[in-house]
A protein has these predicted regions:
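Core catalytic lobe of class I
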Residues: 1-169
């Protein structure tokens, strides 16, 4: 689908999807373009309450379409708003999902901040409907992985934080 996610969800049956992988906009306070002229810009500067409510709505729609034994991989990061850190846990706990595991992705940002330690990590959450859902770890990885191990491919400079394809393959 290439559509607003809430429009697309209307066309997906309940409990019909095995795996969902997403990395939503982080609400960092900018207007972004995809780098592709046929895609429109999106506003990444919602009031925090509205952003979190939208994330909960998104997560609950994913929950609806996910099969009982399915999994969701949700990539997000801790953010700083008005000088205070905001964790994705603030809205993940308000969704219907079970948080099976939190993975730490070291992506080594080259940015720096003169007033705090600059984050080099993002989080990847493994979410399920059922706490008994299991993972078969065929890639023999741990819960912390380094950006340098899995470089994203095929981005051609259009997306600086592309998700490593090897992780989901």
């Amino acid at each position: 689908y290439c559509d607003d996610c809430f429009n697309a969800f209307a066309n997906i049956n309940d409990s019909s999807v095995d795996l969902i992988i997403t990395s939503p906009p982080y609400n960092l306070g900018n207007n972004h373009h995809t780098g592709n002229k046929k895609h429109q810009a999106y506003n990444d500067n919602l009031p925090e309450k509205e952003y979190q409510e939208t994330q909960i709505k998104l997560l609950n729609e994913c929950f609806r379409v996910l099969k009982e034994d399915g999994s969701m991989i949700y990539n997000h990061k801790n953010r700083i708003k008005k000088g205070v850190q905001i964790s994705p846990y603030e809205w993940l706990f308000k969704s219907k999902f079970v948080i099976k595991q939190e993975l730490v992705w070291i992506n080594r940002s080259q940015n720096f901040d003169k007033i705090r330690f600059y984050p080099w990590t993002e989080r990847i959450y493994w979410l399920t409907k059922n706490p008994k859902t299991k993972l078969i770890n065929t890639i023999n990885k741990h819960d912390v992985f380094d950006w340098n191990e899995w470089k994203p491919v095929g981005t051609r400079g259009l997306h600086t934080r592309a998700f490593p394809e090897k992780f989901v393959a």
